[in-house]
Design a protein with these regions (language model features):
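N-terminal secretory signal peptides that target proteins for export/translocation
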Residues: 1-8
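Extracytoplasmic metal-acquisition and chelation regions
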Residues: 28-309
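Bacterial N-terminal signal peptides
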Residues: 10-25
Length: 309
């Protein structure tokens, strides 16, 4: 009987060998378009090698002020799942980007469109919408990623969504989500205990970016350097903040990695309080290389500035 041995297969012409290899089914990774680095990092935690994640912004960009460039439109066009913050954070660019992508899978209301803020309790929800108040979001403050408890809630919802859009690998996503949830909860307990000495501390913010962080750690925001949300600090308003702090001192002033540090540095010099750069998202500082590093770094910076030796 004439049988093909492995040696005989090796002797096949290269073109035939290539055709045989291409005929073997291969898993195509789920293509995920993440608006911000924190959601790209979370998707990677839950999806591993099952996902191919593309992130639209970096930690050094203001997520409010992104342009719907052709390169981003092309990435959205090929995506199986879009993972963004929602709560109007990307309202200035994401709707246009999705419309121009022509990708029916990722339009609002479809399983391929995931808004993280839909799954957490929003803070700073305005009683009435008045644009004279500045860049106010009707759905509430969108910077939900500064509280690790919110990350846990989003992870649970995102794990289910990954199972929905890629049911062939539902079991793998479920296992990854359960593993992440366990590790994340342990980390939250550790971070909360480490930050306990900061409870009740008075702080100043350059932008209303940290309300969820303050809610988690029981910090008290006593002033904001922006006169209105999204409006750059003015000299007169900075003087008003300085006068406020003379009557009721704060322990530190916080600004995000993507922001111009000069207003915070001015207050630091004139009020004699530390200016603390907060990563705000993955990649914002050297220590914030992933989600766990993001909160390791944030807590460490707050403690270094806010706890007297």
């Amino acid at each position: 009987m004439n049988r093909k041995t492995p040696h005989a297969l090796l002797a096949l012409p290269a073109g035939i060998m290539l055709a045989l290899l291409m005929a073997v089914p291969a898993h195509a990774a789920l293509r995920v378009f993440a608006c911000e680095p924190e959601w790209g990092a979370l998707t990677q935690e839950l999806g591993g090698t099952l996902v191919d994640v593309s992130v639209a912004t970096s930690a050094l960009q203001d997520p409010h002020q992104i342009q719907a460039k052709p390169s981003l439109i092309a990435r959205a066009r090929n995506a199986d799942l879009v993972v963004c913050t929602g709560a109007e954070l990307e309202i200035g660019w994401l709707p246009v980007l999705l419309q121009q992508s022509g990708n029916a899978r990722v339009q609002a209301g479809q399983p391929g469109n995931f808004a993280a803020a839909d799954f957490v309790r929003k803070l700073d929800v305005p009683g009435q919408l008045d644009r004279a108040q500045g860049d106010v979001h009707a759905a509430g403050n969108p910077h939900i990623q500064t509280d690790p408890r919110n990350i846990a809630l989003v992870a649970a919802a995102l794990g289910k969504r990954l199972q929905q859009v890629d049911p062939a690998h539902a079991a793998e996503y479920a296992r990854a989500q359960a593993d992440f949830a366990q590790r994340w909860q342990q980390a939250i307990v550790r971070w909360t205990a480490q930050a306990a000495p900061l409870k009740g501390a008075a702080v100043v913010s350059q932008h209303k970016a940290f309300v969820y962080l303050y809610d988690w750690l029981a910090l008290k925001e006593v002033a904001v350097l922006e006169p209105k949300p999204g409006v750059e600090p003015t000299a007169s308003h900075l003087q008003e903040v300085l006068a406020t702090l003379k009557a009721a001192p704060a322990r530190m002033v916080l600004y995000s990695a993507y922001q111009d540090p000069r207003p915070s540095e001015w207050l630091s010099k004139n009020a004699a309080i530390p200016a603390v750069k907060i990563a705000f998202t993955v990649g914002g500082t050297e220590g914030a290389k992933d989600l766990f590093g993001l909160f390791d770094d944030t807590v460490a910076r707050l403690l270094a500035a806010g706890v007297k030796p």
